[in-house]
Amino acid sequence: MNAEFQGRDILLQQLSKAKIIYKQEYAFISIKFKIEGDIEPYPYHVRVPVEMRAFQQSSAPIIFLLHIVNGIIDELEIITADSAEINTDNIEVERVEYEINQEVIVKNNS
């Protein structure tokens, strides 16, 4: 996670203790996380704290949505903006854009 937002380090800790359940269908990929062991819950009541769009040269952007449920990292949902089939072998991540939920934006105190 290259984007900076409040609680990011908590989610990274949760990811380090997660088992991954991968599911792919035509136009989406679901990466579910099952957390094992004790973890610090994400303290913000935001379902999707960060979204990433990866712009592709020959197709619509691919959108990555990180879902949090009850303070626990739950799923990384990956979809195409035009509902086309996702080719996991050719996802380009050279040009990405992040959208941070307003509730968890890191505010500068300058």
Predicted regions span which residues?
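N-terminal domain-onset segments
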Residues: 1-47, 88-110
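Amphipathic protein-protein interaction modules
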Residues: 33-86
